[in-house]
Amino acid sequence: HCKNKNLKFNHILDIGAWVGTWSVAMNSFCGRVVAFEPDPVHYQCLVKNVPEDVETHQLAVGSSNKMISLSNDDFTQAKRVIGSGDIPMVTVDSLDMTDIDLIKIDVEGYEMEVLKGAIKTLENTKYVMIELNNNTKKYGANNLEVEKFLNKAGFKVLFAHWPDKVFVRK
């Protein structure tokens, strides 16, 4: 979709990179991709799948810096944050990255928590691509709240293709 809209990106954060499919695609027309994936199995696949110039981190991203645990979520490949544990979680703001063109967030319902930890970074971000499905309910949020949060942060919907929405700075 981004190629079709002639959007150009120099610096992208891929939060919830899974096995790197999206990072690989974006790396082909982007200057720098930084990918985050907390699941150890998915992270190993991510590292094997992406080119060397994609920066990878085995970290969860959320609303605070702490250690967490993940559990399997029902019968899917998705993981769920369940409390303290041995996986580091960081906020986007704590990464102290500037000039982000696009933040892509696909974290199986934890999207609102990621946004809460990215308030400062969002001020200088041009686009946010976010997967919005019914998983946000698992963490006490809903899709409308996520959209309102982004509107308040200065974004509007550029285009949507369920379950993804791309927001652009107003």
Where do the model's predicted regions map?
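Phosphate/nucleotide-binding beta-alpha loop and adjacent structural elements of enzyme active sites
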Residues: 1-170
